[in-house]
């Protein structure tokens, strides 16, 4: 049933040949992410690939591929292993360059996979506590964003990147 596995940034694409069954309704992939959260991806009977996404960390993860007919009868699972590449959030964080900007900071970044992420910025208050300030949501490939509205005093800015699955980078 499974023909090929293409590991991608934060996931994999599983190519398969659907069973030759007139009663086939869909094919699904069942798996746990690195936080042991059970997830499923379902595609219709006319699709020949499953796109697995949302992994924050590289590693080897088992995935069960299952065919389901109109009576909701499931095939015996075919278990394969995927090995997601580095998640986009890490590459985005590593590409960031911050520069002082009028009333704040400008963050330039690269997002070659056009991942849907948020850049989350915090500052340190006078007691040294981290205080969340704002988020910028983007899926643009290469861009910059200015976090503004701050007094013209020395300010420590702290930033991290988060994806739509709640995966977060360390702070910088």
Where are these regions (language model features)?
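Generic alpha-helix signal with a bias toward terminal, lower-confidence helices
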Residues: 12, 17, 26-28, 41, ...
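Pro/Thr/Ser/Gly-rich low-complexity, intrinsically disordered linker/stalk tracts
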Residues: 1-23, 57, 70-116, 165-172
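Ser/Thr/Gly/Pro-rich, low-complexity flexible regions
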Residues: 93-172
């Amino acid at each position: 049933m499974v023909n090929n596995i293409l590991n991608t940034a934060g996931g994999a694409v599983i190519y398969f040949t659907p069973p030759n069954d007139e009663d086939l309704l869909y094919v699904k992939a069942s798996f746990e992410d690195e936080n042991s959260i059970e997830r499923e991806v379902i595609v219709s009977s006319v699709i020949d690939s499953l796109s697995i996404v949302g992994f924050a960390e590289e590693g080897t993860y088992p995935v069960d591929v299952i065919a389901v007919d109109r009576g909701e009868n499931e095939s015996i699972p075919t278990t394969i292993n995927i090995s997601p590449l580095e998640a986009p959030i890490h590459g985005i964080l590593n590409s960031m360059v911050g520069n002082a900007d009028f009333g704040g900071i400008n963050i330039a970044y690269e997002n070659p996979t056009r991942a849907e992420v948020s850049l989350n910025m915090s500052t340190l208050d006078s007691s040294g506590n981290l205080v969340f300030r704002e988020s910028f949501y983007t899926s643009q490939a290469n861009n910059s964003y200015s976090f503004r509205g701050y007094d013209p005093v020395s300010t420590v800015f702290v930033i991290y990147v988060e994806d739509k699955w709640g995966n977060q980078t360390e702070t910088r």
